[in-house]
Structure formats: structure tokens, C-alpha cells
């Protein structure tokens, strides 16, 4: 059953069942959805996977529409052979600053025997004649990308940049300061099991 509320620009559904080939695979006793293009807080599509190394892998992201220029996505992930991982993505945009901060954290990896994490922050801005920014990338260990596929991996050739910069521009002169450090992923240390 579905109810549409045009005044609130939202719909409500009850007793929904997703069937594949006539077989029920997912059910929801209650859910809401927007009727317009406006963003709305709520669950996003879950992601299911399975592999011999990770076992059953289930992610259920929840999107928080904090404000028109701020949002946050929390993604709990259960990996049956490894443990529980929490993914985070925070995005923001205002007059002098914009960026995104993403991270994943696993308090204890059953296979690795320790905590695991990744962090990416890309923040940039300008104010008057100044420009500034941070591009920070870090993982807990050399094997993180092989064990947990992540978008941070797409941006690197086994070197994770950690850049901070500030520049000033005027009609007659320019100045810039940049501090750079890298985390090198040592592929020769990675074991294959």
C-alpha cells in the first residue's frame, strides 16, 4: 500500500516486497520517499556481496540531509569473516570553504588481528586574495586496499599524498606555501594467501 502526500512532498509505503523471478528477496514493513527532486534523509540501497576471503558482505548506508549545503552518509558494513566496518562521508559547501571527508574504520579485523582504517580529506577554499586547501590521504597498513576496495585507491599509484597549501595573489605579487608528505604503500611487503 502506498500513500502520497503532495503537501509534504513525500510518499509512504507499507508491506513492500522485492521479488526476483517470483522469489521474495527483500521486504520492508514501512518506508518513505520524496515526491520531488529535493534530497531527503533516509536509507540508501543496501549493497550485498560474497567472496571466499570476506564471506558475506552487507552494507546499509544511511543518508543525513543536514542542510542544503551539508550532508553526511553513515555506512555500517558487516563482513562475516573480517568484522564490522563503519564508513563515513561528510560533504560541505559554503562561501569560503568546500570539501569532503571520508573514512572507514574497523575496530578489529578478525583476519588481520588489528584495527584498520582509511581517511581522505579534500578541503579547499578562498577568502579575499587567499586560497587554501588540504588533500590528506592515509591508510592503516599496506594491505588495506587489497583487503577493502575503496575509491581512495583510484587516486593513487601506491603513494598517498598529504598536502597542505596556502597562497596569496594580488595585482603586483603572488606568494605560495605548500607542505607535502606522502604515505608510500610498500607492495613488496604484501603477502598473498
Q: Where do the protein language model's features map onto the residues?
A:
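Outer-membrane beta-barrel proteins and related beta-barrel translocases across Gram-negative bacteria
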Residues: 1-193
